[in-house]
Amino acid sequence: MLGDGNGWVRDPDGSRFWGRFGAAGLLALSQDESRVLLQHRAWWSHQGGTWALPGGARDSHESAADAALREAFEETGLPPTALEVLSEVVTARSQVGWTYTTVLARLVEPRELVPNEESTALEWVPLDAVLERKLHPAFATAWPDLQVQVRALASD
């Protein structure tokens, strides 16, 4: 059902996670795989003012890739047809089974980025410059392992 994933999941310790069925984000690589698309999150959003991947809650009928591609389209204007999905990795888990899946994809058809109200900016950031940004805490934790995976994909 469309939009049925919106809502918080709460762990026994009180920690909250967005997405009743988990969440997913898109790590989009530029065509030459030297840059990653980052979203500067709107101030009103959870962890607003930080940089992260476009993404959000999974709906009950969606795979992680479906959710990441849908959210990326909503937040950046990049249609799924402009991207080639390369891999998926679970980058966060909760005690009650909630997961955040990062979907790695390569841009295959350049498109103009069109931010929605959830973004104050969208930028293609060089891989080595990602840590220079004020990152969403969960993305900052996941980035070192994601960067290793990105570099491995680029060397294939």
Kindly give the residue locations of the regions a language model identified.
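Active-site-adjacent beta-strand/loop module that shapes the phosphate/pyrophosphate-binding cleft
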Residues: 32, 89-113, 123, 127-128, ...
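Charged phosphate-binding loop/patch that engages nucleotide di/tri-phosphates or the phosphate backbone
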Residues: 138-156
